[in-house]
């Protein structure tokens, strides 16, 4: 393996050309991480640096990260005229925004933006600067002009008095979504993931051990592949939350489904959340004493998310998940088939707990008479995306 090689983790940019334009903001120091994240998803990168960018990060470092020659000035082959699938300007300084707004084309970077815009390719601008500069009315006018021209702007919330450049994973996810938007089969998808809990008293809960990882990966992959994804997020372990609807309890999950439907019916519901089957009948108004020696908790069936969705959205597709322990693979598949009939699911992702722990396949996708073995998380995500795309075609 070459020193500059990367481990491929996805194919959402496979065969896609991304022209990375690096301008002279301090966030140019993030170019190495950003370029390598693009490559991990299969992108073929062309890269152009402005003179000001070279004062912050060297072309040598950028060339190592991108695995290609860095364009740093005018040349006879004019690589900026080779139209890519998307131009990514990161960082996009205020000076750069001003040039694009005014049509200035005084270097190869601005020519790359102009050529791609003229060819109807998406332009993604990632400005980063101090809050005072960002909030200046002139900057806001420039950003509004960019959007009016049809360009896309990605910013982060204010932190430490600055609009810092978003994490490479966030930028690449948006890049993938723009490049793949409008693909045949693109659908509006609601993904539920994470655990749920229900209170016994004000400080104690009944919950489950779901980390939310699988649903997060599915939602992430669907968004990268150009689907319009809405997420409902329960409790998760680690940084696994998209910006979406927060849902702590089974009732919250049910309410979230109704909220989503009010904004427009999804084409597909992906139910990867671990929703409690049972919840306490009554919650104690006060903390139960730790000295109690004869504590009993009565349980009742919790609201069933899948039944609610089938009732309020009868014509849409549902992909549900089923996790089992201590049974054989054949028994798992039998239960998955029964689950599809009982719940009206169009497909079921069936898992054994030992598969989640690395012992055996990651899961099985059961739909109709078809059973697909999913050996890895990547295959699981790709399998779900392929099925959704086939429904939307």
Predicted regions and their residues:
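A cross-family phosphate/adenosyl-ligand binding-site feature
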Residues: 1-393
């Amino acid at each position: 393996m070459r020193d500059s090689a990367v481990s491929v983790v996805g194919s959402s940019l496979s065969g896609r050309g991304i022209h990375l334009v690096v301008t002279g903001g301090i966030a140019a120091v993030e170019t190495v991480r950003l370029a390598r994240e693009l490559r991990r998803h299969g992108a073929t990168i062309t890269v152009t640096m402005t003179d000001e960018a070279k004062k912050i990060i060297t072309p040598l470092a950028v060339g190592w990260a991108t695995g290609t020659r860095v364009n740093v000035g005018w040349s006879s082959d004019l690589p900026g005229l080779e139209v890519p699938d998307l131009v990514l300007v990161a960082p996009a300084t205020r000076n750069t925004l001003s040039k694009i707004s005014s049509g200035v084309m005084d270097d190869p970077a601005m020519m790359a933006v102009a050529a791609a815009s003229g060819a109807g390719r998406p332009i993604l601008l990632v400005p980063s600067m101090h809050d005072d500069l960002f909030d200046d009315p002139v900057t806001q006018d420039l950003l509004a002009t960019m959007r009016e021209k049809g360009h896309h702007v990605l910013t982060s919330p204010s932190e430490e008095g600055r609009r810092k450049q978003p994490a490479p994973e966030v930028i690449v996810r948006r890049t993938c979504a723009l490049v793949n938007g409008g693909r045949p089969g693109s659908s509006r998808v609601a993904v539920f993931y994470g655990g749920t809990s229900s209170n016994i008293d004000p400080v104690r809960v009944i919950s489950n051990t779901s980390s939310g990882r699988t649903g997060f990966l599915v939602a992430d992959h669907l968004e990268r592949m150009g689907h319009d994804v809405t997420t409902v997020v329960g409790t998760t372990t680690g940084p696994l939350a998209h910006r979406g609807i927060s849902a702590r309890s089974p009732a919250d999950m049910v309410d979230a489904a109704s909220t989503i439907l009010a904004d427009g019916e999804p084409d597909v519901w992906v139910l990867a959340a671990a929703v409690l089957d049972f919840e306490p009948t009554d919650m104690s108004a006060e903390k139960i004493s730790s000295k109690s020696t004869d504590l009993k908790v009565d349980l009742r069936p919790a609201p069933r998310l899948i039944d609610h969705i089938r009732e309020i959205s009868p014509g849409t597709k549902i992909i549900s998940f089923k996790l089992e322990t201590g049974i054989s693979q054949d028994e798992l598949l039998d239960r998955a088939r029964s689950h599809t009939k009982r719940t009206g699911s169009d497909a079921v992702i069936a898992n054994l707990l030992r598969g989640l722990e690395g012992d055996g396949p990651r899961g099985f996708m059961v739909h109709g008479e078809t059973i697909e073995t999913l050996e890895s998380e990547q295959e699981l995500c790709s399998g779900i995306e392929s099925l959704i795309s086939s429904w939307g075609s």
